[in-house]
């Protein structure tokens, strides 16, 4: 069964479940390129890296298991609250701080959090999954087929754009594929299969509880640790249909998310 694409790109259950210059500083990178800049001391993990020694496949698996395990109250951002996916109480031991998924946001939340200057940050821009509750054989391709239409996103740190996503589901060489207009500092990840556990009280609607084989596809930004001080992370999503062939059943979805971070040494 598909989830409502008005609010989610994720699908599952009994059906379907980011002047050229580079200044190298200790543990940080400064990028400048046409139309997109980077704030001082902000680094982005590239697609060829393993953030903190962990593959992107494993990060996707951890993200989905932790995000889906949250009930509606836990997954709802509160005014002035701190919604961190992989830490309901204290995130001090986590190497990467996981921010909320854009598909589940229907108003522009602002969260206020404290994190360490040793922690990286995961911003999921537009992501989906499928699992063995579906009769689809290729779970990764199944997840990929849920991310339809024109998908655009921008990530800013301290008001400075550092990542940009702009892809469009199109007919490419006679078959449907993504036309990439921009994939700057964004990691597109189509994961290997992993084990996904869905609890009875998950905040995701129309799910069948249980443990399944699953796969994920989507676009992420993996930020390297920020320097100590106050920082603001903003990321958004703009999903718009492109036609009955390239985005069947897709409804527009817009979300804007802000995290105000106190980064301690």
What are these regions (language model features)?
Residues 40-96, 253-255, 261-265:
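N-terminal segment immediately downstream of the Sec signal-peptide cleavage site
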Residues 14-18:
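Short, hydrophobic alpha-helical membrane anchors of single-pass surface/secreted proteins
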Residues 95-198:
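Extracellular-facing segments of soluble proteins and assemblies that are Gly/Ser/Thr-biased and enriched
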Residues 118, 228-229:
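Beta-strand-connecting loops/turns
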Residues 152-228, 236-264:
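Extended, well-structured beta-strand/loop surface patches
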Residues 1-13:
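N-terminal secretory signal peptides that target proteins for export/translocation
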Residues 19-35:
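Bacterial N-terminal signal peptides
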Residues 123, 231-235:
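A short tyrosine-centered beta-strand micro-motif
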């Amino acid at each position: 069964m598909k989830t409502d694409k008005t609010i989610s790109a994720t699908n599952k259950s009994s059906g379907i479940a980011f002047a050229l210059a580079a200044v190298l500083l200790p543990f940080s990178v400064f990028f400048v390129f046409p139309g997109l800049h980077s704030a001082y001391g902000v680094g982005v993990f590239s697609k060829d890296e393993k953030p903190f020694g962990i593959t992107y496949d494993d990060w996707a698996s951890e993200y989905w298991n932790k995000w889906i395990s949250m009930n509606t109250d836990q997954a709802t951002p509160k005014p002035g609250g701190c919604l961190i996916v992989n830490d309901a109480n204290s995130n001090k031991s986590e190497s990467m701080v996981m921010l909320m998924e854009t598909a589940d946001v229907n108003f522009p939340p602002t969260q206020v959090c404290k994190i360490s200057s040793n922690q990286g940050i995961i911003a999921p821009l537009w992501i989906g999954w499928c699992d063995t509750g579906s009769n689809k054989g290729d779970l990764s391709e199944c997840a990929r087929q849920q991310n339809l239409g024109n998908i655009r996103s921008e990530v800013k740190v301290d008001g400075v754009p550092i990542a940009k996503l702009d892809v469009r589901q199109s007919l490419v060489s006679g078959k449907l594929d993504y036309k990439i207009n921009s994939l700057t500092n964004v990691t597109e990840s189509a994961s290997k299969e992993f084990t996904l556990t869905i609890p009875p009280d998950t905040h995701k609607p129309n799910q069948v509880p249980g443990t399944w084989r699953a796969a994920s596809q989507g676009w992420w930004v993996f930020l390297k640790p920020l320097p100590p001080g106050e920082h603001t992370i903003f990321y958004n999503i703009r999903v718009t249909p492109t036609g009955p062939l390239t985005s069947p059943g897709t409804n527009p979805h817009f979300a804007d998310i802000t995290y105000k971070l106190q980064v301690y040494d």
